[in-house]
């Protein structure tokens, strides 16, 4: 009897530990918030891997509306989305861009959707029609209005003759 009880407890514990480590694959996951706060957004991916730690997203796309009604678009190969804290950590081939022909790219980024702050690191490159800036790190806030560059910063300005 003792052996049977121990065996069933072992099985119960084993199945419980497997449930907490289970990864669920989701095709085309999509997260959005509209109208609840000023921070309207939509994040979608080709595939999601849900685990107790969060949701890993593969081939991520997103769009975020600023307080000034400017849309910021984003894409990356990998993202870790935390809906509770409303932030996304991005990796590999990250690009943020606007309809005003402004783009910024890097290897890693975090985007806090509540505050609207985007932090990019490793091989940061900002481009618009007139300026190209390379940096180690960049922090964006207020849409693309406030940009702070850190580390080795190189700026190229194009002067167009009229």
PLM features: what roles do these ranges have?
Residues 1-162:
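Mature-chain termini and adjacent capping regions
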